[in-house]
Curated annotation (Swiss-Prot):
Protein's name in the database: Tyrosine-protein kinase csk-1
GO biological process, one term: nematode pharyngeal pumping
Family: Belongs to the protein kinase superfamily. Tyr protein kinase family. CSK subfamily.
Biased composition (Low complexity): 131-146
InterPro entries: Csk-like_SH2 (IPR035027), Kinase-like_dom_sf (IPR011009), Non-receptor_tyrosine_kinases (IPR050198), Prot_kinase_dom (IPR000719), Protein_kinase_ATP_BS (IPR017441), Ser-Thr/Tyr_kinase_cat_dom (IPR001245), SH2 (IPR000980), SH2_dom_sf (IPR036860)
Chain's role: Non-receptor tyrosine-protein kinase which plays a role in pharynx function by regulating pumping and the orientation of pharyngeal muscle fibers, independently of src-1 and src-2. May phosphorylate and thereby negatively regulate src-1 and src-2 activities.
Protein's organism: Caenorhabditis elegans
Catalytic residue positions: 403
Amino acid sequence: MSNGNSYNHHHQFPMSIPISCSSHSIQSQSRMNTLNANRDLLSPGNDVIVTRTVSPSFYSHGMPARDNVFRKDDHVRILGNTTDPAWYRARNANQEEGLVHADCVVRINGQAYDNGIVRMRASGCDVAPGAASTTSSTSSHHSTAANHQPWFHSMISRENTEKLLRGKPDGTFLVRESTNFPGDFTLCMSFHGKVEHYRIEQTSGGQLTCDKEEYFSNLTQLVSHYKRDADGLCHRLVTPIICETATFSSNGSSSFGSSSTVDLEDRTSVFRHAGLVISSNDIDVGDTIGHGEFGDVRLGTYKNRKVALKVSKRHGNGMLDSLLDEAKFMVGLSHPNLVTLVGVVLDDVNVYMITEYMANGNLIDLLRSRGRHALERRQLMMFAMDICQGMCYLESKQIVHRDLAARNVLLDDDLVAKVSDFGLAKKANSQSHDSASGKFPIKWTAPEALRHSQFTTKSDVWSFGILLWEIFSFGRVPYPRIPIQDVVRYIEKGYRMEAPEGCPPEIFKVMNETWALSAQDRPSFGQVLQRLTTIRNTV
């Protein structure tokens, strides 16, 4: 494709085995019949799926190079024809343009593209004539499970949804049952003053998808995925609109969590012992500067120093426990490349976790906004080394981060990179097994961690390799053309991503070393840092 592609042609897997066709078969009458039959399907604006990866012998004379031809299972939109009646111009969701052969495509779900549903692009309307619905039993299962989530609003109308979301910060969201597609759901999100609606479609097997590329077993997994990265949506999911009618457990507490005063005292004693409890009178709370998993992030001032305040209500939204757990894990950590915990505020109507203020935001946003024209290779190397030094410190403390990615790296005034977001961190010798329910980012997590919950510092090393790929690709989403549910299977069959465009070979070698299938074959963070130091002095 014109923007490059991330597949490694040296690692074959079932979905991309080239199919050879003789020149005689191309000219056969049956093929011409197929071309004629597909004429309506190939009208500009239609969405199709590529059914086969064709080999160079399948090309007409003078056609472009192989990388300009879409591959098996790509979802593309037809742009128009070419001088060769067998070939059509098309574009995928990443805005990459290329070619498809007329008898190597089929309709999506057996239907021509309908303007009412734009794949991975909010249309403002979730109505598509003739769209099939899934079984009520599967829908009921998903609805029942989702009732325990604060962002699920069941049968709320579209009109009331827009009243709740309109004017809210970008990324504020809720999930509701679809009124026009019984059995499906709708993801609704505020963006640039408007409300965008994404249809969540159920497959015949009960899986859920927004784009027919990423599939999820339940709504919780889907929401967790899009909280980590927009991955084609207009914005990543940030702050849920809490449903006031959420179900309650048998003991009377909200199914998405509440905390008694006594329990809160017990769980915050670690901060008191560490001298990290700060009076609300000593904090000046300023404007909202972001939105995180727990709620708003606000700018504040403490002792004439700018700080960031993560805010959680004391009761009713189920996020207080997570905020306190993250803050508790940060107690005692001290390194120039880790975001520093300043303290917690417990005597306010809200609970605040106070950290140092990082003026340049997160790394993924900076990579994508500035790009290769503004960020020199030397700066990319500094990001990599900063992060690696922070991870060396965690390695020495036998702490596993478990969510290492560019989105969880923050940058200070001087663009020093610091690892943040310790919500999933644990001690390396911990016996907890909690990899279920979509908590962990599949494309960043080592295969043994996903398969067997084996989280070690070596699984963090794997994630660091993915982070390196993010840095040198200037913020691309890893495995951009592989469905999320297939990533582990491809990795175990030997597939690895190609080097990003312009990536130094020495850096790509480090990436591949961190992606050794066996955890014991991966280098330690100390060894990775030594390699990066050598590369920095030579590149």
